[in-house]
Every structure is written in structure tokens, then in C-alpha cells.
């Protein structure tokens, strides 16, 4: 798969992960040229960790991978949408989606795994 998006070296762009069947928004992360190349090469979502400053394969610690089905680019070519098959939860807090609570703090998602067990904190 070729990419029409060229991400300049050192630049990060937002990458939204969305369930390819339901349309549910799962998470927002950032991607650079290295992560995009690895995603295209493997078919598994890779992102750039801003906090760790390194490439990160989604699910490398938890097993909760994102199998990429389609990649869309926005009109300005400065954000991408990954349509994925989510294995397990997308959120490191144990929820299927990182968008599991309302602005006033009400929980609207369901926790599907215990992060303390998965990440052995």
C-alpha cells in the first residue's frame, strides 16, 4: 500500500482510530513518517509515543492490537483516520474506547480488562 501523505521528518500528525465495522471512535494518537511506514508495512497500527519519544506498536504490551483495514486522510493532509479491527480494548485504562466518559465525568463506557493485570504495574 502506498501513501499519498508525506509527513515531514520530525513532525507528528493526529491519527484517529475508529472501529471499521461500527464507526466507534476508539482513540486519538500521533503518527510520524516512521510510524506510518511501519503501519503500511505490517498492517498493524503503529504510533509515535510523545511521552516516551519512540515508535509504539499498538498492543505491544497488552496484546490489544489494531489491525488496519483502511486509512483515510483529511482534506488538508494533516490528519489521518485509521479504520481498524480492534483486538480487546483500545484504552490503556481498560476501556474499549478512550472516549468512555462525559465532560462532567460520568462513565459511559464499559471496562473490558483490568489494566493492573495486563500491564503488571
From Swiss-Prot:
Gene3D superfamilies per the UniProt record, alphabetical: 4.10.80.70, Phosphoribosyl-AMP cyclohydrolase (3.10.20.810)
One GO-annotated biological process of the protein: L-histidine biosynthetic process
Needed cofactors: Mg(2+); Zn(2+)
Cell compartments where the protein resides: Cytoplasm
Domain of life: Archaea
Enzyme nomenclature, EC number: 3.5.4.19
Record GO cellular component, one term: cytoplasm
Keyword Cytoplasm appears in the UniProt entry: yes
Pathway annotation from the record: Amino-acid biosynthesis; L-histidine biosynthesis; L-histidine from 5-phospho-alpha-D-ribose 1-diphosphate: step 3/9
InterPro entries: PRA-CH, PRib_AMP_CycHydrolase_dom, PRib_AMP_CycHydrolase_sf
Annotated residues for binding of Zn(2+): 75, 91, 98
Keywords: Amino-acid biosynthesis, Cytoplasm, Histidine biosynthesis, Hydrolase, Magnesium, Metal-binding, Zinc
Principal location listed in the UniProt entry: cytoplasm
GO MF annotation list: magnesium ion binding; phosphoribosyl-AMP cyclohydrolase activity; zinc ion binding
Enzymatic reactions: 1-(5-phospho-beta-D-ribosyl)-5'-AMP + H2O = 1-(5-phospho-beta-D-ribosyl)-5-[(5-phospho-beta-D-ribosylamino)methylideneamino]imidazole-4-carboxamide
Cofactor note text: Binds 1 Mg(2+) ion per subunit. Binds 1 zinc ion per subunit.
Residues where Mg(2+) binds: 74, 76, 78
Function statement: Catalyzes the hydrolysis of the adenine ring of phosphoribosyl-AMP.
Subunit structure: Homodimer.
Annotated family: Belongs to the PRA-CH family.
Name of the protein: Phosphoribosyl-AMP cyclohydrolase
Taxonomic source organism: Methanothrix thermoacetophila (strain DSM 6194 / JCM 14653 / NBRC 101360 / PT) (Methanosaeta thermophila)
Species classification: Archaea, Methanobacteriati, Methanobacteriota, Stenosarchaea group, Methanomicrobia
